[in-house]
Swiss-Prot record:
Primary gene name: Btg1
Gene3D superfamilies in UniProt: Anti-proliferative protein, N-terminal domain
Protein name: Protein BTG1
GO molecular function, one term: enzyme binding
Modification type Phosphoserine: residues: S159
GO biological process, one term: cell population proliferation
Lineage: Eukaryota, Metazoa, Chordata, Craniata, Vertebrata
Subunit annotation: Interacts with CNOT7 and CNOT8.
Gene Ontology cellular component list: cytoplasm; nucleus
Length: 171
């Protein structure tokens, strides 16, 4: 099998996890129909697969990580914007539906995110590299994020609370 097809096959789970995560924000706000959500998800999956196809390196998962990073920070990620346009969502509507600061890393074998510049990094998806070349031998598991990360999502925070005490130790 051609190496590109092997690489492309391995990114399916990672892309699906990232798209599902982003789509949940649209679903939670209830401003899109189920059909619009499906169209958005399918479009975003196709856009990400095309965008990543020459930047996916299962043998070196960190290589190309910056290129694959999905980022919202005062600017909308262009791929999310394109998928949203296909269902008629304007940039303004999209900014209301998604966190104002979101970083989503889509890497071979792991998808993780951070909401806010100071937020915790939470893992959405993990997989172990396959021993052989078969996709079936890959141990895949969706990770149920830590409670603190879930709470950030449910509370709609863009940054963690600054109400904390810092402990210092001097020797």
């Amino acid at each position: 099998m051609h190496p590109f097809y092997t690489r492309a096959a391995t990114m399916i789970g990672e892309i699906a996890a990232a798209v599902s995560f982003i789509s949940k924000f649209l679903r939670t706000k209830g401003l899109t129909s189920e059909r619009q959500l499906q169209t958005f998800s399918q479009s975003l999956q196709e856009l990400l697969a095309e965008h990543y196809k020459h930047h996916w390196f299962p043998e070196k998962p960190c290589k190309g990580s910056g290129y694959r990073c999905i980022r919202i920070n005062h600017k909308m990620d262009p791929l999310i914007g394109q998928a949203a346009q296909r269902i008629g969502l304007s940039s303004q509507e999209l900014f209301r539906l998604l966190p104002s600061e979101l970083t989503l890393w889509v890497d071979p074998y792991e998808v993780s995110y951070r909401i806010g510049e100071d937020g915790s990094i939470c893992v959405l998806y993990e997989a172990s590299p396959a021993g052989g070349s078969s996709q079936n031998s890959t141990n895949v598991q969706m990770v149920d994020s830590r409670i603190s990360c879930k709470e950030e999502l449910l509370l709609g925070r863009t940054s963690p609370s600054k109400n904390y005490n810092m402990m210092t130790v001097s020797g």
